[in-house]
Amino acid sequence: MKLTVQPVDINYISQIWPLIEEYLQEALTKDNGAPSWSECYNIHHVQAFITSGVWLLLVATDEDKTIHGAATVSFSNYPINRVAFVTLIGGRMISSQDTFEQLKMILKQRGATKVQGYGRESIVRLWKRFGFEPRTTLVEAKL
């Protein structure tokens, strides 16, 4: 099955939300070795981030326009790089070189020079095939 990765215009978020919510909820609740996102935000916060334009929503569709996965991306500007950070990813999204190339093109069109994201070990192994390298270990303490 050939998947097409595409951004969702902010004006259509409410229309497709029922079709993608389960993919993002799955990403929130799946243990991925990253911080417990449920302590930071829930699915309602995610929807607010997307509908307000803070996060970009991407979907993966087949030839019949059926959605098979969804992802969200935030952007951070640093002095030397504009980093696209994959905040959530669920379903079948970036599982092949082709879908990764599509993701890269979309992020480059939005000015990104790097892409980053947290991932459990299986995602790290998969994404290493696409040129990702583990960068650091995140540590955290409650204040």
Describe the residue ranges of each PLM region.
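Short amphipathic alpha-helix that is part of the acyltransferase structural core
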Residues: 1-40
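A residue-level signal for beta-strand positions that form part of recognition/binding surfaces
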Residues: 2, 83, 136
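Charged/polar, solvent-exposed surface patches and flexible loops
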Residues: 15-26, 48, 105, 125, ...
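Acyl-donor binding region in acyl/amide transferases
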Residues: 81-130
